[in-house]
Amino acid sequence: MRKTHTEIHLRNEPEHGHKEYKYLYQQMLKDDVIRKAYKKLRKGKTKRKEIQYIDAHLDNEVQKMYDMILNTKPEGVDVPHPELAYKPKKRTPKIIFEHGKRRKIYMPEIHEQWLHHIIVLVLEPIITATAYLYSCGSFPKRGAHYGKRQIERWLLHDPKGTRCFAKMDIRHFYDSIRLKILMKELAIRIKDDWFLYIIGLCLQGFNKGIPLGFYISQWLANYLLEPLDRLITEVLGLPKLQRYMDDIVIFASSKKVLQRAIVEIRKMLGQRFRLKLKHNYQVCKFYYEKGKRKIGRALDFMGFIFYRTKTLIRKNIMLSATRLAKKMERSKEANRGYFRRHIEAMLSYMGWFTCTDTYDCYQSRIKPYIHVGRLKKIISKIKRRQNHEGMDQGKMLRGAAGAAACG
């Protein structure tokens, strides 16, 4: 009997037209892939001792990574040097508190991070080829500002189609992902047992939940939710979907449509992924004014507060920015220099102010205390100095890669 489109989404079965991928393990062994992965890994970490050591012995370290991957294969497969195979180390989590939430962060060893970057280099074109266009959060050039621009377009150009919105997120998303289910989903399109074995090995010890802090985790999490994006946009016919990792916003013309969609979303998450929506999901009319009455509510999403004709910054971000500005002003009055992390944080906050309708707030709460132009000059000077210091090292890395290519 032929299965319906909805049944295919509820069960982990391949959909028509989806490409299958083989020989990914062989790609991991390519010299240029290993070197490119290391180049990405070392960004922003050049002062770490492990990175400096690898820089000084790059060719040897590349060969070690090659040997490690070559000898990491499933049980029963002959390898030349089994003692060189990748063996996951015991990980001790670091507890952090972020936005009022307690999170466990796992910090892998440097060679393990390198392996993760190699895996992502191979996986990235596979995942991005079929990823939903407005899925944000971990894809390059698809951050909060990318998502914000699209929401503003929808609100401005389609008032009828954005009368109502549903906002929801998945309960304990990272901690609730089951490794067996994740590996089954990967196996739908990836027909390379050796490649899948290495991914499974990286996540060994996490039968339920994938670790925050692993570079591969965010990519695998996005891959897992691709079928959910297709269910909402294609099967349920709701194209105005914005997903920021596990935070989901859907616009529609009526609440009934959104309520029915939530039923299907919960069904799919439960049956296919063994995941649950949080119970505090919202289905609301979008904010509008009728005479002197204010009806509905604004959308609070990705750090922004969206109205029909304006976008503001979330209150806690604005308060953090103003407190930092005053703190830097006190340092200046005491004839103390600025910390680099404070300068970079302040310039980062300026990104929120420049892309939202908060100029009055900037004028009254930020501008009297700091000079943004001077901060930019300080950071520019620091980066120029770092570039000069790292120029010889960069030549060495490029030269080593070129020599390997010639060989």
Label every PLM stretch briefly.
Residues 1-67, 386-407:
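Non-catalytic, polymerase-adjacent accessory regions of viral genome-replication enzymes
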Residues 1-9, 108, 113, 117, ...:
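Right-hand nucleic-acid polymerase module
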Residues 8-14, 22-24, 116, 120-178:
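Active-site-proximal segment of RNA-dependent polymerases
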Residues 33, 67-101, 114, 191-205:
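Reverse-transcriptase-like RNA-dependent polymerase core
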Residues 86, 239-244, 277-279:
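Short beta-strand
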Residues 101-131, 207-234:
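Conserved pre-motif C helix in the palm subdomain of viral-like polymerases
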Residues 121, 168-170, 253, 304, ...:
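Residues immediately flanking
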Residues 149-245, 249-270, 284, 298:
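Conserved polymerase palm-domain catalytic core
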